[in-house]
């Protein structure tokens, strides 16, 4: 999987950037996504997280991770519903699945609050957001159990334990 990473803060260590790419590629394999799958991750501060949270969720506070799922039917591209694309073309298309915005301030706060490493927290936030982009949620106890169980399974298998 290709992950475009942007550090708007200029403060994220290169090891965290590489780990984020690796853990997301690992999670993509776990979900059997195509190797050509693409997404982006932007590291932001709390002020930018607050702006984005207000813009996309109408919530007036910063948050740890914002997940924006790409929905082809809401894109600028137009495909006629009756149009059939050749199978070869469909296989070649690189599916962009969405973007994450991770607050570095919240990551540091939460790592301290939960008593685990900053590496674990960045991994947790990346995988959590990734699962949201791929249709997982935690509105009900059943959904929460499924999503958090899969999230923990991915992080543990990758090596980011508590």
From Swiss-Prot:
Functional description taken from the UniProt entry: Single strand-specific metallo-endoribonuclease involved in late-stage 70S ribosome quality control and in maturation of the 3' terminus of the 16S rRNA.
Protein name, UniProt field: Endoribonuclease YbeY
Location(s), subcellular: Cytoplasm
EC code: 3.1.-.-
Family the entry assigns: Belongs to the endoribonuclease YbeY family.
Any one of the GO BP annotations: rRNA processing
Source organism superkingdom: Bacteria
Cofactor: Zn(2+)
UniProt cross-references to SUPFAM superfamilies, sorted A to Z: Metalloproteases ('zincins'), catalytic domain
Record's keyword terms, sorted: Cytoplasm, Endonuclease, Hydrolase, Metal-binding, Nuclease, Ribosome biogenesis, rRNA processing, Zinc
Class in the EC hierarchy, top level: hydrolase
NCBIfam families associated with the record: rRNA maturation RNase YbeY (TIGR00043)
InterPro entries: MetalPrtase_cat_dom_sf_prd, YbeY, YbeY_CS
Record note on cofactor: Binds 1 zinc ion.
Annotated Zn(2+) binding sites: 128, 132, 138
Annotated GO MF terms: metalloendopeptidase activity; RNA endonuclease activity; zinc ion binding
One Pfam family it belongs to: YbeY
Organism: Lactococcus lactis subsp. lactis (strain IL1403) (Streptococcus lactis)
Presence of keyword S-adenosyl-L-methionine: no
Chief location category: cytoplasm
């Amino acid at each position: 999987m290709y992950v475009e990473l942007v550090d708007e803060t200029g403060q994220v260590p290169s090891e965290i950037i590489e780990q984020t790419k690796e853990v997301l590629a690992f999670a993509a394999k776990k979900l059997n996504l195509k190797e050509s799958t693409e997404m982006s991750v932007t590291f932001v501060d709390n002020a930018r997280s607050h702006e984005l949270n207000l813009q996309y969720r109408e919530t007036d506070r910063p948050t740890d991770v914002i997940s924006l799922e790409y929905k082809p039917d809401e894109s600028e591209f137009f495909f006629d519903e009756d149009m059939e694309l050749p199978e070869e073309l469909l296989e070649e298309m690189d599916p962009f699945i969405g973007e994450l915005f991770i607050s570095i301030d919240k990551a540091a706060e939460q790592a301290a609050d939960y008593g685990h490493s900053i590496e674990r927290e960045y991994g947790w936030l990346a995988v959590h957001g990734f699962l949201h982009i791929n249709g997982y949620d935690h509105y009900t106890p059943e959904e929460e159990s499924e999503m958090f169980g899969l999230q923990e399974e991915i992080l543990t298998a990758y090596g980011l334990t508590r």
